[in-house]
């Protein structure tokens, strides 16, 4: 991602004026061993399956893709983002093959069936409804570990 000083003025102004949440003391739980965890990906790369509705500027919703999907597209609005590595190997941003290898080798318990993508750079407050829906879906699927991949 580009430096904020190199962004267009309108983007720089938008990002500079975002209210960031204040976190007091987070609640932590003792995690289970990695070999028992079910892992799902959440990314802000605006990734979706080919044919799904593309993300729009400051989209508040999310897209779902399956652990077996490989025909994925990135519709992130940041023009300064270099997509060349992604175009050669989707594992650069969505490491599904690596996670499946880790599960097969017993390093992690399993890979969730569903994974989630958002449009980065949107106001987090406007995404809360969608984020809660994703959390609900992950809980239903037994996900206890999320691999966060910001773009």
Tell where the protein language model's regions lie, with residue ranges.
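An N-terminal assembly and electron-transfer interface module characteristic of large anaerobic redox
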Residues: 1-151
């Amino acid at each position: 991602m580009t430096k904020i000083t190199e962004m267009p003025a309108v983007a720089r102004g938008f990002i500079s004026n975002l209210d960031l949440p204040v976190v007091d003391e987070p609640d932590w739980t003792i995690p289970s061993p990695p070999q028992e965890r079910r892992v799902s990906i959440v990314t802000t790369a605006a990734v979706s399956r080919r044919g799904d509705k593309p993300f729009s500027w400051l989209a508040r919703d999310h897209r779902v893709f399956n652990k077996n999907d490989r025909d994925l597209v990135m519709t992130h609005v940041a023009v300064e983002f270099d997509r060349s590595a992604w175009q050669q190997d989707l594992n650069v941003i969505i490491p599904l093959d690596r996670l499946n290898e880790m599960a097969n080798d017993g390093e992690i318990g399993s890979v969730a069936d569903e994974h989630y993508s958002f449009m980065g750079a949107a106001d987090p407050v406007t995404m809360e409804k969608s984020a809660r829906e994703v959390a609900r879906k992950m809980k239903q699927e037994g996900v206890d570990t999320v691999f966060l991949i910001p773009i």
